[in-house]
UniProtKB/Swiss-Prot annotation:
Protein name: Oligoribonuclease
Coarse class of the protein's main subcellular location: cytoplasm
Protein task: 3'-to-5' exoribonuclease specific for small oligoribonucleotides.
Compartments it resides in: Cytoplasm
Length: 180
């Protein structure tokens, strides 16, 4: 059910960090309420890319996405970028009105750069604000290192897992770092 207070969490996996030469290869979304309770998980989409594009990945991306099985899922996928964008928007429309949720995640500015270039309709679905868990991680590292160090991520670099970890990390900071 649509609620303007729901939050949209998104994560992208890309072939690299530069939107001018790299592309999106996987995306996932989760919608939570304002208390960070998961309401729905959106589609997890491997986006088809050519073998030539995949061969252009650097060593870190080649190893990481190869070991996780993502590279093979991308090769086998029949879903292009436009279809992935449309499927994700259709999911979000069920839960959050356009322009209401900030874009939520970890280092989410990087994801938004790719959305702006490759999925402008999806990028425009978000409010202009960011809910970036990385900000709290940086602040906790400076002001309360024991709080930062007490949260361990598995770092699978798979989009849905990364979102789940971002939500769990924000819950951790809410409990141990943010004081009402």
């Amino acid at each position: 059910m649509q609620n303007p207070n729901n939050l949209i969490w998104i994560d992208l996996e890309m072939t690299g960090l530069e939107p001018e030469r790299d592309v999106i290869i996987e995306m996932a979304t989760i919608v939570t309420d304002s208390e960070l309770n998961v309401l729905a998980e959106g589609p997890v989409i491997a986006i088809h890319q050519s073998d030539e594009t995949l061969a252009g990945m650097d060593e870190w991306n080649t190893r990481t996405h190869g070991q996780s099985g993502l590279t093979q899922r991308v090769r086998e996928s029949r879903i292009d970028t436009a279809t992935a964008e449309a499927q994700t928007i259709a999911f979000l429309e069920q839960w959050v009105p356009k322009g209401k949720s900030p874009i939520c995640g970890n280092s989410i500015g990087q994801d938004r750069r790719f959305l702006y270039k490759y999925m402008p309709a999806l990028e425009a679905y978000f409010h202009y604000r960011y809910l970036d868990v990385s900000t709290l991680k940086i602040l906790a590292g400076m002001w309360a290192p024991q709080v930062k160090d007490s949260f361990q991520k598995t770092a699978t670099h798979q989009a849905l897992d990364d979102i789940r970890e971002s939500i769990a990390e924000l819950k951790h900071y809410r409990q141990h770092f943010l004081k009402a």
